[in-house]
């Protein structure tokens, strides 16, 4: 149950009954401090100002008609007109019992929408690097959360599989095959192969002419060029899938919807934009001038949708892409996990999409932008030599460092168990370090911080789960086979349950805002509440059996909540570390 939403509805009804205009926001929030209750309604003051009345007097009118029977034990007016709400112990205990009995931990399914999530999007014939990490793991965490809530999510891996560079790549692939027969390439070779192709293109005019010819042939559907192009795509995606599998990312080859998918739509889009009077010829190119965006002279900004030579641009592809996602996929929401530097480009494409009537306003187009990964020097994260860090190399180093950490913490474990634990911790550490940060900010990549067992880190959260789960091994019982009822006998128990009951709020916030750090913060706070409870409230040596069973139930609900929350982030838990 989303208790915040429940109370918000109750306060909204009371506001209206007290004379507030229909639809006035109740603005119910989790209280920042225990002395202000569990929730606080902050909407009274805005309404009082609107009505020209005293906020505290109006707050009292709201309280007089506020029905929180069976939910709150106390309500009070604080400060200039806040309403503090204290949940009753009986209500909390009842909700905790219901959550523990529910495989979904009390999280309700939402009315299903069709949601397209555009994330990861590496380029063909290049290896994934650290710059692809944020889109890949942030997008995947949000996708998992949306699916948990019951939505139909279509993963769209919008790979860069088209463009003039394929002419030189195909020409070079043909050269290599003629010299040495059939070529079997790993992507590590393709990185060098790409550089070699570019060098030949820049320095060998005969090669460059052939490459440009192959661009035209590829675009016109030539069979040989199409075969070579497919080989480049296949080799790339096989290697990318290894990274996805290592990171426990839910993308597969079936989710690839590359730029090339929209090629046939592009001429029709430009023709339609011209017919609608949106695109006009300017210096031989087809341009859409947008009043919503100004150039440096304060004039409407021109967005090119077709070049003078007839070629199309990324903007044209993105217009077609949005149109396809609405018309063919039936999207209610489209989420783009693309870095913040692309914001203006997306806004321009979407403005054209709306003006042309390709996607109605009822469909939400959302740019879930993210910042950069920085090194300790505050500059973009690079190798020591100043090069781009390959994602596979980063994951390899994470596993080595995690193995050293596990060896120092638990050297007596069997080697295969140490390796399995290290791999799980390594991938979790890399992902959680990113997911725990607000996605719009840049963040500093720091091995020591991300592998620490203190603070808001993956090792800390994984250990928190292991610690809670170990209670049941010591008690000799299963967390799925507990007796008795949950009864609150201590303030720390109440505080723990109150935090546990905020799980649905965290899940819904991640889904609504595309911000996985909300879940990380929630889980970290939950682990802290459990530590306080564990220190103050003995479980295995509780004063009587009923209290022991009640506290075991709270431990079980905590373990299940941490496990489910981490799972939504694409992070595995461990039974021991």
Swiss-Prot record:
Supply the alphabetized keyword list: Aminoacyl-tRNA synthetase, ATP-binding, Cytoplasm, Ligase, Nucleotide-binding, Protein biosynthesis
Motif window: 'HIGH' region: 122-132
Q: Where does the protein principally reside?
A: cytoplasm
Q: Which GO terms describe its cellular component?
A: cytoplasm
Check the record and name the Gene3D superfamilies matching this protein: Arginyl tRNA synthetase N-terminal domain, HUPs, Isoleucyl-tRNA Synthetase, Domain 1
Enzymatic reactions: tRNA(Arg) + L-arginine + ATP = L-arginyl-tRNA(Arg) + AMP + diphosphate
- Which superkingdom, per the lineage? Bacteria
UniProt keyword Nucleotide-binding present: yes
Taken from the UniProt record, the cysteine pairs bridged by disulfide bonds within this chain are: none
Name the InterPro entries for this protein.
Answer: aa-tRNA-synth_I_CS (IPR001412), Arg-tRNA-ligase (IPR001278), Arg-tRNA-synth_N (IPR005148), Arg-tRNA-synth_N_sf (IPR036695), ArgRS_core (IPR035684), DALR_anticod-bd (IPR008909), Rossmann-like_a/b/a_fold (IPR014729), tRNAsynth_Ia_anticodon-bd (IPR009080)
EC nos: 6.1.1.19
| SUPFAM superfamilies given in the database record | Anticodon-binding domain of a subclass of class I aminoacyl-tRNA synthetases (SSF47323), Arginyl-tRNA synthetase (ArgRS), N-terminal 'additional' domain (SSF55190), Nucleotidylyl transferase (SSF52374)
Question: What binding partners and quaternary form does the record give?
Answer: Monomer.
Q: Which family does it belong to?
A: Belongs to the class-I aminoacyl-tRNA synthetase family.
NCBIfam families from the UniProt entry: argS
Q: What is this protein's record name?
A: Arginine--tRNA ligase
């Amino acid at each position: 149950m989303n208790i915040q939403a429940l109370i918000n509805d109750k306060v909204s009804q009371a506001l209206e009954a007290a004379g507030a205009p229909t639809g006035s926001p109740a603005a119910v929030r989790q209280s920042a401090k225990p002395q202000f209750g569990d929730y606080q309604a902050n909407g009274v003051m805005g309404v009082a100002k609107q009505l020209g009345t005293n906020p505290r007097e109006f707050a009292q009118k709201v309280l007089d008609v506020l029905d929180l029977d069976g939910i709150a034990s106390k309500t009070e007016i604080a400060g200039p007109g806040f309403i503090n709400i204290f949940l009753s112990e009986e209500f909390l205990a009842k909700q905790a019992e219901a959550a523990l009995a529910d495989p979904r931990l009390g999280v309700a399914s939402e009315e299903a929408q069709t949601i397209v999530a555009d994330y990861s999007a590496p380029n063909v014939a290049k290896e994934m690097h650290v710059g692809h990490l944020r889109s890949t793991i942030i997008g995947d965490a949000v996708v998992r959360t949306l699916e948990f809530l019951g939505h139909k999510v279509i993963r769209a891996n919008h790979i860069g599989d088209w463009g003039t560079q394929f002419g030189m790549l195909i020409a070079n692939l043909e050269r290599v095959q003629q010299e040495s027969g059939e070529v079997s390439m790993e992507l590590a070779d393709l990185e060098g192969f790409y550089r070699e192709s570019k060098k030949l293109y820049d320095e060998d005019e005969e090669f460059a002419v052939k490459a440009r010819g192959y661009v035209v042939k590829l675009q016109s559907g030539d069979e040989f060029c199409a075969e070579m192009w497919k080989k480049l795509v296949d080799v790339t995606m096989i290697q990318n899938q290894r990274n996805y599998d290592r990171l426990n990312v839910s993308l597969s080859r079936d989710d690839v919807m590359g730029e090339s998918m929209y090629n046939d739509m592009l001429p029709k889009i430009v023709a339609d934009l011209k017919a609608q009077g949106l695109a006009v010829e300017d210096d031989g190119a087809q341009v859409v001038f947008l009043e919503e965006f100004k150039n440096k002279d304060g004039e409407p900004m021109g967005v090119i949708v077709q070049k003078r030579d007839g070629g199309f641009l990324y903007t044209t592809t993105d217009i077609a892409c949005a149109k396809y996602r609405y018309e063919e996929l039936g999207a209610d929401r489209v989420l783009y996990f693309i870095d913040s530097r692309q914001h203006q480009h997306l806004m321009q494409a979407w403005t054209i999409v709306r003006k042309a009537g390709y996607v109605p306003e009822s469909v939400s187009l959302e740019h879930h932008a993210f910042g950069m990964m920085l090194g300790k020097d505050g500059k973009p994260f690079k190798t020591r030599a100043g090069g781009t860090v390959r994602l596979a190399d980063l994951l390899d180093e994470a596993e080595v460092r995690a193995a050293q950490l596990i060896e120092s913490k638990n050297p007596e474990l069997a080697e295969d168990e140490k390796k399995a634990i290290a791999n799980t911790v390594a991938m979790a550490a890399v992902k959680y370090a990113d997911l725990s940060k607000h996605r719009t900010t840049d963040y500093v990549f720091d091995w020591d911080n991300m592998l620490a067992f203190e603070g808001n880190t993956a090792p800390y959260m994984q250990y928190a789960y292991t610690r809670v789960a170990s209670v049941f091994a010591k008690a000799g019982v299963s967390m799925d086979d507990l007796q008795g009822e949950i009864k609150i006998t201590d303030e720390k128990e109440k505080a723990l349950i109150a935090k546990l009951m905020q799980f649905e709020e965290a899940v819904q916030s991640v889904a609504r805002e595309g911000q996985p750090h909300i879940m990380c913060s929630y889980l970290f706070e939950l682990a802290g509440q459990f530590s306080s409870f564990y220190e103050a409230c003995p479980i295995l040596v509780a004063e009587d059996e009923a209290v022991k069973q009640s506290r075991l139930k709270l431990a079980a609900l905590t373990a299940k909540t941490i496990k489910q929350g981490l799972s939504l982030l694409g992070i595995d838990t461990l039974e021991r570390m």
